[in-house]
């Protein structure tokens, strides 16, 4: 059953050094505030999983929190590369980073398999692809019924999944709407799940066929308004395109990046204080 906690309390209790951690959210509802809190608390040796690593994982990798990344695409959307990710892979700064690259369909199916309690996922994929040549976790099996060759990949079972959502009720049930990626599957695949939300209400008034994550599947719900900035939260605020553009020169240089996180993340007590500090600089 989900507890209503501060984000600081949730990260302290449920994210441990060495954990496999998935921060999911596609296009919007990206759990930025949670990534900041993981950095503030100095979590390390993490195996990060995310279908589309963007700024949140550039931050975590550059801050020295990660030892491995499982992913299916990485970049600063609409801008360019993730320079802290590249620096870690190419030059081992601040830590050497092991990478485990998959296709989108592969990783989505891996989450589904994890949520289903299965050891691996099976899919039609990788015909003509070079990924199986460089990723030993992509294997091939023959269907026992038709003989067809299929790809097989390990399921993803995070120690903890973190997502951002629009609403939760006071019992800890969570409502998401708009574009959904694999938040539901990642939450159900995990041993523990933290959800940050824009607001906590008495009644979700959930529309038919909406995505509701029940309290029994979650560990903690944290009230963090604006917690997915600079991504958008459908129905609450728009994407901050200027922030994504401004991130590129910050992340390109090690000293500039380190000074930025020291001032804006390690130098603030929580995401609310971070937001106020960012607003001052605009």
Curated annotation (Swiss-Prot):
Sorted UniProt keywords: Aromatic hydrocarbons catabolism, Transferase
Keyword presence, Transferase: yes
EC number: 2.8.3.6
Pathway: Aromatic compound metabolism; beta-ketoadipate pathway; acetyl-CoA and succinyl-CoA from 3-oxoadipate: step 1/2
Gene Ontology terms for molecular function: 3-oxoadipate CoA-transferase activity
Keyword Hydrolase (UniProt): no
Pfam families cross-referenced by the UniProt entry: CoA_trans
Coiled-coil region: none
GO biological process, any: beta-ketoadipate pathway
pH profile of the protein: Optimum pH is 8.4.
Enzymatic reactions: 3-oxoadipate + succinyl-CoA = 3-oxoadipyl-CoA + succinate
Family: Belongs to the 3-oxoacid CoA-transferase subunit A family.
Subunit field text: Heterotetramer composed of 2 A and 2 B subunits.
Protein name: 3-oxoadipate CoA-transferase subunit A
């Amino acid at each position: 059953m989900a507890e209503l906690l501060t984000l600081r309390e949730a990260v302290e209790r449920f994210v441990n050094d060495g954990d496999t951690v998935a921060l999911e959210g596609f296009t919007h509802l990206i759990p930025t505030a949670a990534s900041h809190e993981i950095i503030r608390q100095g979590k390390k040796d993490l195996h990060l999983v995310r279908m589309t690593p963007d700024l949140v994982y550039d931050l975590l990798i550059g801050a020295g929190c990660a030892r491995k990344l499982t992913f299916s695409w990485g970049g600063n959307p609409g801008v360019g590369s993730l320079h802290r990710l590249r620096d870690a892979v190419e030059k081992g700064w601040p830590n050497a980073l092991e990478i485990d690259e998959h296709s989108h369909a592969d990783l989505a199916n891996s989450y589904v398999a994890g949520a289903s309690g299965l050891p691996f996922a099976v899919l039609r994929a990788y015909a003509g692809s070079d990924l199986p040549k460089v990723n030993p976790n992509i294997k091939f099996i023959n269907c026992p019924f038709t003989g067809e060759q299929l790809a097989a990949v390990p399921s993803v079972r995070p120690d903890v999944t973190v997502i951002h959502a629009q609403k939760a009720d006071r019992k800890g049930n969570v409502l998401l709407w708009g574009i959904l990626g694999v938040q539901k599957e990642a939450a159900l695949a995990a041993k523990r799940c933290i959800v940050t939300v824009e607001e906590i209400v008495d009644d979700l008034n959930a529309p038919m066929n909406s995505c509701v994550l029940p309290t029994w599947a979650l560990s903690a719900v944290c009230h963090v308004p604006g917690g997915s900035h600079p991504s958008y939260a459908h129905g609450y605020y728009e994407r901050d395109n200027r922030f994504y553009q401004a991130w590129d020169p910050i992340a390109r240089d090690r000293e500039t990046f380190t000074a930025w996180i020291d001032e804006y993340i390690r130098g603030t007590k929580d995401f609310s204080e971070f937001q106020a500090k960012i607003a001052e600089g605009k």
